[in-house]
Amino acid sequence: MSNAVKRSTDPTVFSPPRQFSFLRHAAVLKRRGVSRSKHYADIQAGLYPKPVAIGPRAVAYPDYEVDLLNAAKIAGKSEDEIRALVAKLHAARGAALSS
């Protein structure tokens, strides 16, 4: 039997991977295919998670969050569903340290 974590095909079901990498801002914009202003507008509207501080003057995004949100868009999720997903992602960030 495999030790691999079984991933859901539903983009609203969150299961963080055991390994991930951080994507810097330019890489996120490229993966999303949006402008810088649209990206920040989505963050303000709750449609995209806030970046994670990785240094005193550097921020990035966990790659799995970017992929999960892209999958939600592809699946045709509504803005309300995406806001709920973003809220789950933010909550999971805090819960990761407490487990």
Where are these regions (language model features)?
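Glycine- and charge-rich intrinsically disordered segments
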Residues: 1-8, 89-99
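Polyanion-binding surface elements
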Residues: 2-45, 64-76
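Residue-level detector of alpha-helical recognition elements and their boundaries
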Residues: 43, 54, 66, 81-82
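Short Lys/Arg-enriched helix C-cap and helix-to-coil transition segments
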Residues: 50-59
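A short, Lys/Arg-enriched interface patch at domain edges and termini
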Residues: 67-97
